[in-house]
């Protein structure tokens, strides 16, 4: 979840260092993070050198930083449960999928029916591993 925030923003900032992204139940829009404890907001704000108030309007949410990742040609695989109430699929990964594809980016998604926020990954992680290996770019 929060790792998706940091991983995506790393890719947007340093695209030459990223061959592919694996996002699992990613928090991609800080404004729509209903299941997240407000105490964690302070930590996220501190990591970005912002106040909690400034965090709500700053362009640090991955959904505001899609263009550099698409331009770099970084493929993404995302996994999410369709019953996640901590980081809702419809407000995060589903929005990224629509916007990323509309911008010309490659994104594959695996939806876990009936699954909530945890456990992360898949019982059989082979589809994730295969995607990463298929899109691994040693030159990056």
Regions found by a protein language model. Give the residues of each.
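Active-site micro-motifs of SAM-dependent methyltransferase domains
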Residues: 4, 28-29, 117
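Conserved hydrolase catalytic core segment
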Residues: 9-19
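Mobile cap/lid helix-loop segments that gate and shape the active-site cleft of serine hydrolases
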Residues: 19, 26-68
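Alpha/beta-hydrolase-fold catalytic nucleophile elbow
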Residues: 24-25, 79, 112
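Short beta-strand/loop motif that positions the catalytic acidic residue
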Residues: 77-80, 84
């Amino acid at each position: 979840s929060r790792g998706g925030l940091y991983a995506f923003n790393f890719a947007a900032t340093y695209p030459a260092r990223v061959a592919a992204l694996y996002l699992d139940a990613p928090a991609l829009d800080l404004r729509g993070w209903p299941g997240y404890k407000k105490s964690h907001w302070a930590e996220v704000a501190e990591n970005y050198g912002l106040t909690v108030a400034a965090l709500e309007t700053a362009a640090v949410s991955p959904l505001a930083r899609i263009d550099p990742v698409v331009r770099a040609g970084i493929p993404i695989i995302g996994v999410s449960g369709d019953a996640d109430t901590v980081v809702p699929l419809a407000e995060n990964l589903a929005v990224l999928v629509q916007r990323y594809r509309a911008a010309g980016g490659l994104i594959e998604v695996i939806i876990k029916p009936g699954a909530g926020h945890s456990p992360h990954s898949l019982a059989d992680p082979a589809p994730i591993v295969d995607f990463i290996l298929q899109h691994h770019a040693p030159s990056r």
